[in-house]
Every structure is written in C-alpha cells, then in structure tokens.
Amino acid sequence: MVQKEVLELKRRFKKDRATFPRVCGVYVDANKQKQAAMNKQFLNLDEEVMHKYLEIANKTLSGKVGDALLNVNVHGGSEDQEDMTKLLMGVKDSHLEDDGLLNAFYDRVIETYDSAEPYYIILFYDAYDVMTKTSDNEKLDESEIVYEYILCSICPVKLSKPGLGYLEAENKVGLRIRDWVVQTPAVGFLYPAFNERSTDINAALFYSKNTKEPDHTFMESFFRCTAEMTKTEKKERFTSVLRNSLAESSNDAVTYAFHEKLNELAEERMEQDKEEEPLTAEDVKEIAEEAGIDEEKAEQIAKAYTSSFGNDKPTAGAVVDSKLLGQQLIKENAELKAKIVDLMAENAKLKERLNE
C-alpha cells in the first residue's frame, strides 16, 4: 500500500463517516488468559466510547508507509501461512459474528504476541464502497467494488499513575483509586491490504508504534513471514555502517560531505520518479569517493553496506541524515550573518573616516 491509500481509508474513521458495522475485542491478563470479551454493533456504542475506539483505529493506521506502517506479504505458500490466511479470511467473511473463529484468532495473537503486561485485542470490521476515479482523480458516482477488511489493534493496558484526588463519597482529598487504562496500540494490522484501491488477500499492512525497535518477532510469528526493517531502523543501521567504517579517519566535514552527495542522489531520483530505487553498493562507493574519501576506504564502506543490508537495501532518501544537513545549514547561515555584521561594522568605520 502507498500513503494515499492509507489516507483514503483513514478519512472514514470519523464519527460522521465511520461505517464499522461491528467491533469486538478481548482483554488478555498478565497470565495470557482471555477475560472480558466484547462484541457489539459499532454504531450502538455510547458516543464517548465510540470516539475512543475511533482514536485507536486512527492510531493503528498512523505514520508513514515503510516506517510505522510496513507492507507484509502473507502468501508464501507454506501450510502455516495458508492456515493463517484462511483464518483471517474467515474472521472477515463472518463479519465478526462467529465466536469460534474469533476465539481462534485471539488464541493465535496470544500465542505469538510476547508481553508480560495485560493488553486489549480489538477487531474492527468494515465494508467500503470504493468509488471509481478518473485519471485526474475525479470521483464517479458508481461503486465498482466493495473492499471488506478487518483492522486489528493490540493495546497495552497499564495502571494509571498514583496520585491525590477528590474522593466524592468521603468528601475528602486522598489517594485516588488506580485504574487499568487502555493505551494507544503498540502494534496492529490491516487485512487484506488495500493495494491499488482494491482487495489484495496476499498482503497485509502492519503497524508498529516503535519504529526504532518494532516487534518483528510478532510480525514474523503471526504472519509466518520475513519482516522488513522500518525506515528508522535502516537509517540507524546505515549511520552505524558509515561511522564504523570511517572510524578515526573521518571528521564531521567528511560525514557532512557524504550525506550532501547522498541527498543530491535522492533528489535526482525523485525528479526522475525513481525515488523507490534501492541504493546499491556501487552508489555508496561512488558517493564516498565524491565526498573526498579515498578509493580503498570507499570500497570498505560499500562492502560493509552490502554485508549489513543484504537484499533489503534502502532508498537513498531513506538514509539521508536530514538533521545533520539542517544543522550544517543553520551553522553556515549563522556564520554568513556574522560576516555580514562584521562587513557592516567595517563599512561604518570607513564612512566615519571619510567624513573626518
């Protein structure tokens, strides 16, 4: 899925637009036991409760595709994957009304999701009449397909912070009762994917709140797939490769020059509509040499890059250190302003001498 398709779905997650026929969930305690199952028609929820569930649904599709949101291939041909796909399709096709399938789904989550804390599994079901669009993105009246999907959110449940509060029954201020509060989702997923604005049963969209250390274990165990790195992980790994390869032989100027050249490549590919083209080892070597790094060291960086990323290579734009470039730009602007101030002061002194 691309960002535009995610936003198209999220636009529906508002009170006046939400059409979820049903929502269900179960609380899982610290001993991995199911408690307090819930299954209701979404529009029958109290207004405040509905608002909170919509917040969770929105959060489960938040962030950028390739970072917080990862496309997952769920069709690998293995028996485990076929069983998992069959279960997900069954849950979707039942419109969340088959308790046996729901319990099987919950059990699979509990089996594959590693958490020492209690959590709340939520499932939304929706059917979206996908409007046909013309080449200039104008909507037509007719709906060609109905996109049916489930959205799963796994939310940690934590004790509220201790503190003082007004105890109305006793008419005094004292220690308030600590409640177990449902947090924003740590992970979640959309199935089937909404690829090219249509149903793709061979793919899912996985959400991870933590992009630095996403829950790859759950993703791989649940979907029986190989997890890809987030853009944040790729960027940090690339930074580590560059730092370790340069070691003591580098300085800030060399690192800046490298990222400046890398950024030029990213912008060039964007202009050519090739921004998704992977950064090759040859690209890395060429950039290093253009940044003033000697050929031998550039070759070492390229080899370390290949060893670290294998076939899951990032794009140039994904690993550019924009923060470093921004800081350097601020520094250069400050230096330029200081020079201008000095020149203005010298100019003022010259005028004074001429007027004497």
Give short role names for the model-derived ranges.
Residues 29-351:
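Long, hydrophobic alpha/beta structural blocks
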Residues 8-34:
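Leu/Val/Ala/Ile-rich N-terminal alpha-helices, chiefly Sec-type signal peptides and the beginnings
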Residues 2-7, 41:
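Acidic, metal-dependent phosphodiester-chemistry machinery of nucleic-acid enzymes
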